Amino acid sequence: MTLRKSKLKYTAVTGFFEHDTQPGPPFLATTLPGLGLIDRVYETDGKFDPQRQKAAWERFARYLDHLNRPGSRAVYKLLYAARHGQGYHNVMEAEIGTVLWESHWAKLVGNENMTWADARLTAVGIRQAEDMKAFWADAAVNLKLPLPYRHYASPLARCLETCERAFADLKLPCAAGEVPPFEPRVKELLRERLGIHTCDRRHTRSWIRTNFPQFSLEPGFAEEDELWCLDVRETPEEHADRVEAFLDDVFSHDVVPIISVTAHCGTFEVLCHLIGHPTVKSAPGSIVPFLIKAEAVLDEESVDGTASA
């Protein structure tokens, strides 16, 4: 496979969230109170909140608007990375251990007790997704945390269900403002590393449309899963190429500054690598925010001044 070359450079803008400065080995991140936003001073506070009366999230949101002011050469987005709730594949791997899972059981569709091909949420996973919804409702009202304007999800069943349970029909008191429309978009690029593991083989297009009708499917979304192979595992480089292609798509075509992405632990680890952020391993049902900066990459001709007019 020939890897693509992005025309954008992505950088994690750190110093805003507690997980931005990870002190040791990768840790299993859970949803922190207020998503771990650090109560700090912003250069926009002088005009926006001179008396320091506004909530920390209100001041951060105003600063994000400032970063994206007209004339800025970079684009900034706040990405809420939501890992799906516990799936049956997670249960099986925990029971038998990673070595046995990787060598044998991950290649099967299930056993006599459970099915983990395109794994669905367990009862625990459903509660985790519902806890996400409760978090969003509480944080939006009490912390003034801005809700995402756009929702993206991996087409795997556990991600679709997590996203739907976390955001569909989310209600806030009238005084707290309106909830952005829930019009989620499915992105193949967000999938977990492809191949061999049946838990990462998706259902058909028809099944997704029937079971999750609110989710829009991108053009070219095939009826059958044409990306997953029974005996070939996607390389880490190919996985990273996919995630970078997702960033390219979103930063090039979606103007909203705040998005949610419901996907997989492996996908978010790749994201951390791409943006230069300390590795964050997300626990099932957790939400971790990242502030990401995108800048155009000048080609060599532009740099040496030989580009044509």
PLM regions and their residue ranges:
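Active-site-proximal alpha-helix that buttresses catalytic centers in soluble enzyme cores
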Residues: 2-181, 186, 209, 231, ...
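Short aromatic-enriched loop/helix-cap "lid" or pocket-rim segments at secondary-structure transitions
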Residues: 90-96, 164, 196-200, 273-274, ...
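Catalytic lobes of large eukaryotic enzymes
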Residues: 206, 291, 297, 307-308
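Short, solvent-exposed loop/turn segments at secondary-structure junctions
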Residues: 85-88, 156-159, 190-192, 226, ...
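Domain-level recognition of soluble alpha/beta enzyme cores
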Residues: 101, 276-301
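Histidine/lysine/aspartate-rich catalytic loop segments that bind and position anionic ligands
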Residues: 185-195, 201-231
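Beta-strand elements within well-structured catalytic alpha/beta cores of enzymes
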Residues: 77-82, 152-153, 257-267, 271
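A short, acidic, amphipathic alpha-helical segment used as a generic capping/interface helix at domain edges
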Residues: 239-255
